[in-house]
Amino acid sequence: MTRSTPLFLSAILTFAQAPAVPPQQAQQPAQGDTKQRVRAVRDMAGKGQDAIPTIAPYLRDIDLSVRLEAVKALDDIGGPKTVDALVEAARDNDPEMQIRATDGLVNVYMPGYLKTGITGTLSRAGNSIRAKFSDTNDQVIDSYVEVPAPVIQVLGRLSRAGASLESRANAARAVGILRGRAAIPDLLEALNSKDNRLMYESLVAIQKIRDPAAGPGVAFLLRDLDEKVQIAAIQTTGMLRNMSAAPDLRQVIDRARTAKVRREAVSALAMLNDPADRGIFLRYLNDKDDGLRASGAEGLARLKNPEDRPVLDKAFEAERNTNARLSMAFGVVSLGNLQMSEFSPLQYLVNTLNSKAYRGVAIAFLTELARDPAVRQAVYPVLTHATRDEKTGMSIVLARSGERDSEPYLDALVKDPDPEVMQEGTKSLRTLHTRLP
């Protein structure tokens, strides 16, 4: 039995519900078509990028198994030439198609992402899709990587109106990884979904994009009943420096259900840099909770009140908890101690770049401190005899906060005999050039 022309035209006009069979397959028997087309796509995939134009039409096939085989083939091939086809696949109404297309798009701009994305955890029962999201969500492309507008548009639309909550949450994660600023309205709308996973992924994406204009749209979640969502909202409020939310953060501190929420609220308040909160920071600097001591020190660091220097000096010398001591070192340096002696706070921060457990904390503090030209001048001499981890860590810091005076030092790292240092230096110099006018 062959397909009639009216049926073929109808399939084209309604491809969102029933994508059309590629013309070259239209005259084959219906029962045999599916298996033959699946095999055909698999055979094409082995030809690499040259097969992309031939595979793409199968994304509009009437049979889902064929469309899935096509998007899998595109994911496996990878590379910029698959982008247009994957954007088309992301518009499919099936959630698995949306998820596979999303991960494939991210993989183009962050090679290797398919191994860490949720695609490998997918399970399907009929139209129901289940996926396992990892708790680690710190990936983000380098700032010099350019992502075409249609990619961000389709991912934003999926985060707002995907076929399943899993595909929406996955798209929100992808928007964050790709720094999709244009999709912020979609992420803010996703915050109203009442689904904890989707709300959390949307908040983390907003954090990565770092657009302060999004701050007010997050404030309503500062008292959310789900602790994970509430903490993400608190962190986002601090990162985006939403000053209008300061009263809400103070209430959260007073009424926090857990110590973890209180710590995050004090930390977020510390990012807002309001002198009215100095008393709060001084109080928590001596708290028995090391996380609260750390947040108190960070708040005083950003206020830069000279009267707090002796208090922070004393706290730094007495502190034994690594996390809190790093925050106190940050505070002492912020208030003007730029010495680079063996036991000085600034040297302590640089030394901590060698610690796998606390490297990220040290990079964050040094990034903030290095916006001050005097701090940069203090650390430049260290780079000549630094360890590999110190060189790569400071390379990241200078990429984010350096200025023209940082170029010669990054140039030196680009020429470093250590391949790892050279690679990080090359990326960092490119990031710096992208940032600077």
Residue ranges of model-derived segments:
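Terminal, low-structured helical/coil segments at or just beyond the last alpha-helical repeat
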Residues: 416-437
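Amphipathic alpha-helical scaffolding segments comprising HEAT/armadillo-like alpha-solenoid repeats
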Residues: 18-28, 48-60, 79-91, 111-130, ...
